[in-house]
Amino acid sequence: MKKILLLILLVSIFLAACGGETPAEKVTDPQQPITVGVGKEFTIILEANPTTGYHWEIMGELDQNVVKFVKNDYTSTSDPNLVGGGGLDIWTFKSVNAGETRVTLGYYPPSNDPVDPQQTTTFTVIVK
């Protein structure tokens, strides 16, 4: 009887470990298309240095029928005591329906006037 209970416990632990949700796909290379399933999140990670006033923004309109913006976070990758140290801008999106679209981000200088971005990067997103 103890062996059966132990076996049931081990199988339950194994199944619980397998049932977890897969982590969001993390992408840094715009040359590689992002392929995700419907309802899944993915992140685009870009080098950034907001301490200098530069910042990333979504350019144009997202195709809300295919992907939606979820959130934007920043993580420092430099010594916290270093003024002007950079880090990573982490953009999270969620796929909504099957389709293909593009997400374009622009890196803008510090300014109150509308200006062209210093850099742009475009990611192709394929939702299956």
Map each language-model feature to its residues.
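Positively charged n-region of N-terminal signal peptides that target proteins for export
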Residues: 1-4
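C-terminal motif of bacterial Sec signal peptides marking the signal peptidase cleavage site
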Residues: 15-17
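N-terminal edge beta-strand
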Residues: 21-44, 49
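Short, solvent-exposed loop/linker segments at beta-strand-coil boundaries, enriched for Pro/Gly
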Residues: 52, 60-78
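Aromatic sugar-binding surface patches on proteins
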Residues: 83-90
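Glycine-centered tight-turn and secondary-structure capping sites
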Residues: 93-103
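Beta-sandwich strand segments
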Residues: 111-119
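Interdomain boundary/hinge segments at the C-termini of tandem beta-sandwich modules
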Residues: 125-127
